[in-house]
Amino acid sequence: MSFQQKEREKLAELMLEVGPDAPTLCEGWTTYDLAAHLFIREHRTHLAGGYVVSALKDLTRSAQEKAKQQESYEHLVNEWAAGPPLHIKPLDSFMNVSENFIHHEDVRRGSGTVEPREFSRAVETKLMGAAKMMGKMALTSSDVPVVLTPPNHPPVTLGGKRGVAEQGDRVVRVKGEPGELLLWVTGRDAVQVEIEGNEADIQEVNRQL
């Protein structure tokens, strides 16, 4: 079973355990909202454009609310837990390594601080790759270069319209495990990372997806 499949299974189990009204790290969303999001994203792909295109946000938001009105929480979770439809399966790794991990942590950490999980080197490599990919999108408008620095993997430099200074003193360095860095670049603050740099530069960092 792949990493994203294991995360799907664990997230579904946790969502059924905590119920539809549990908090998540997704601002304003309960687990019911998250279940509807996961369902729409894979099973109503023609309505999911608002997750990536701002002009379609109202359409997707409406579809999400309609799914909650028409389907029970358990149905939405179980439909998603059964796996992606056939036309999406070839894209499962590309689409869901970060998605399933991030939302699993959104529920795990939604009600308070949770210790990060430990992963194999192979999984860490996947998560670091996802952090790089998501970070390129999230930090594209940031003027300040951000260097993600995991303990056992090469550092990754993101953002920074002005580039990294020769002395490297006008950068923000974020240190943490790959999974924590992935959560941080996607806007989560309930993470265990160390952020180093000039305070003004840190305040300039703009994480936006």
What name fits each language-model region?
Residues E27-I40, L56-K57, A63-K66, K136, ...:
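Short, charge-rich amphipathic segments
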Residues F3, V18-D21, R44-L59, H75, ...:
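Structured surface interface patches that mediate subunit assembly and partner/cofactor docking
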Residues R61-V77:
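Acyl-thioester-dependent acyl-group transfer interface
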Residues T30-T31, S72, E177:
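Short, structural beta-strand-to-alpha-helix junction motif
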Residues S2-E7, C26-T30, E65-K68, D92-M95, ...:
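Short, contiguous, pocket-lining structural segments
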Residues M1-G50:
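An N-terminal domain-cap segment
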